Structure formats: structure tokens, C-alpha cells
Amino acid sequence: MSNVNMDFEQAGELKIGQVGIATLRIRTLNVPRLIQEMSDRVTRAPKLFRRTAVILDFGELPHPPDLATAKALVEGLRAANVLPVAIAYGTNEIDLLSQQLGLPLLSKFRAHYERQEVAAPPPQSTPPISTGRIQHTTVRSGQQLYAEHCDLTILNTVGAGAEVIADGNIHIYGTLRGRAMAGARGNAEMRIFCRDFQAELIAIAGRYKVLDDIPTELRGKAVQVWLEQNQIKIAALD
């Protein structure tokens, strides 16, 4: 079984969401580097990332950026053909920053920041994964197929420009030419299995790889894709 893993530290981690909006989790407040990383992503996969909407998440920084730095980041991302559309909810300083930038806050990120200020509520149980959804026909370019709380099995082809998403695992018994995203609600244990692997993009729990990041020796092969230590792994099936 061949295995491929390409690890490198990034100033910003881009996670793909299930509704077509990505989250840019900023790890290092190095504006030129962040802009260059996003510009490189657009260059490698323009159909996926050009003019893509992103949410800026400053939650991993010890302090939010000042207004001048935040403006430089937003303007630089726009110049790189990436569109910041919101800021992840955070502290009062981030609230003020969002107002100054004219970007809305997303309240679903509130718990991430208030975790240490209030007692944590009991963990919510994850909805059980059902028996799964089966797709018999081709998923054509421009179509999106989502299997909520279950696995997705496709007995045909996923065309270029098509998108298949599942909260569980994804099994594709034809050719994958489009995008496949498993573990869409954040379950990092989910996997993608494919008989003929020619994907534009693959993602597990938001972590992703695009076509140019996938070794050529795996294209056209039967593979499995999984997440290990927050890194996408791809292996040919024997």
C-alpha cells in the first residue's frame, strides 16, 4: 500500500465548509505570508478558490490584530481574488474590529471564545449515523449531493465540477472527477473510498487537498482517503 503525506506549517489553515464557505483560521499574523498562501491556493486551483468566500477566524492568536493590520489583510485577500465575508465571533475587541471593517460576526463561533468564561455545558450527543444514502446515477457538473447524518454510496461517476458531501463516509464505485467531502460535521474518523481517483478536491472534516497536491501515481487508482494527525493521507487499495 503506497502512502503519501505532505506536511508543512502554514500561517493560515483553510478549512472547507459544507455550504461552500471556507474558514481561514489565522495561526500567525504575518499578513504578506497569509496573502501569499491564499494567492498560491488560487493559482493552483482557480476553479475552486478564485473569488471564494472566507470567514476570518482570529481565535488562535493571543491578541486580535489592530485595525490597520486587519485592513491590510482584508485588502490583500481581495487583491488575491479571495473574498472575506465575515469574522468568527470572538472577544469584545473582535466585535469592535468587525464593526470597523464593516464585516458581520458569525455567532456560531461564540462558544469557542466564551468557553473559559462560563461553565461548559454538557456535551451534545452526535446524531447517529444511519444506514446511508445510495446514488445510482451520475452526479453531473454543477450538482451538489449531501448525505446528512449518514454515509454516501455512489454507484456511478462524480463529474468534474460536481460536489458530493456526507457527514459519514463516502464510497464511490465509479470515477471521482469532482469534489468529495466526508465528515462534513467535523467527524475526523470518516473516510473516502474511490475506485477511480481523479478528484478536483478531497476533504475530511474540513481538511483538504486539491488536484495539484495529489501525487500523479495515485490518479486513476483505487484509493482510500483518511485524516491522521490533522493531515490528509491517501493510499492505494490493494
Swiss-Prot record:
Subunit structure: Interacts with MinD and FtsZ.
Keywords associated with the record: Cell cycle, Cell division, Septation
Matches recorded under Pfam families: MinC_C (PF03775), MinC_N (PF05209)
Top-level taxon of the source organism: Bacteria
GO annotation terms (biological process): cell morphogenesis; division septum assembly; regulation of cell division; regulation of cell septum assembly
Keyword set includes Cell cycle: yes
Keyword set includes Cell division: yes
Role of this protein: Cell division inhibitor that blocks the formation of polar Z ring septums. Rapidly oscillates between the poles of the cell to destabilize FtsZ filaments that have formed before they mature into polar Z rings. Prevents FtsZ polymerization.
Name of the protein: Probable septum site-determining protein MinC
Classification lineage: Bacteria, Pseudomonadati, Pseudomonadota, Gammaproteobacteria, Lysobacterales
UniProt family annotation: Belongs to the MinC family.
Organism this protein belongs to: Xylella fastidiosa (strain Temecula1 / ATCC 700964)
